[in-house]
Design a protein with these regions (language model features):
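Binding-site signature for planar aromatic cofactors or substrates
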Residues: 1-193
Length: 193
């Protein structure tokens, strides 16, 4: 969740389901499962349409990759193979409260920005912009806190295939150039230990 902080937030309101893609910050507090914080544009109807106290779902998409049947050694033996998709995802269920407080928002976006700028050679800080401009921008957003009630990890990493096919997938993905292939290969290799 921390490694891939763009959550798909699914809520229900008077107009039905609503899905938003929101960068968030995951916190360990309150125990036992923690919370998720974020902000949305004030113009986004989510904060007005959300039925207070109703369940919400935050989906964190992990690595995912198409798996060609050509990676399976069993293709040459039986030909009984088809393509699939391997993936890892986390579903966080909880309830939300919206926060329309300028000081809370300033503190939150300062911390969120610092976390995402930390690895840069010259990190941008909220204080780099004129205070009046930041004040104006803060009036255009609403914060939220999502109290996590349950976490469910879902993954499919070719674990249903015979060991030889799993090893073929690991070898094939390790030779790929993208990060998702390498992450799925590592998950499958770790599972086989």
């Amino acid at each position: 969740m921390r490694a891939r902080p763009l959550a798909t937030l699914v809520t229900s309101g008077d107009k039905g389901l609503n899905a938003n893609h929101i960068p968030v910050q995951t916190l360990n507090e309150p125990a036992p499962l923690g919370s998720i914080r974020g902000h949305i544009a004030r113009a986004n109807p989510l904060w007005r349409d959300y039925a207070q106290g109703s369940e919400a779902l935050a989906i964190f998409q992990g690595p995912h990759i198409y798996i060609s049947p050509s990676l399976y050694p069993s293709k040459a033996q039986t030909g009984e193979v088809v393509p699939t998709w391997d993936y890892a995802v986390v579903h966080a269920r909880g309830v939300m409260r919206f926060i329309d407080d300028p000081e809370w928002l300033r503190s939150f976006v300062t911390g969120l920005t610092a976390a995402h700028e930390a690895s840069r050679a010259q990190p941008w800080k909220i204080d780099d912009a004129p205070r009046e401009y930041i004040d104006k921008m803060l009036r255009l957003i609403v914060g939220f806190e999502f109290s996590i009630l349950s976490l469910t990890g879902k993954w499919k990493v070719s674990q249903n295939r015979p060991l030889a096919d799993q090893q073929g997938v690991v070898q094939g993905l390790q030779g790929a150039s993208d990060a998702d292939s390498h992450e799925i290969a590592a998950m499958l290799a770790a599972r086989g230990r």
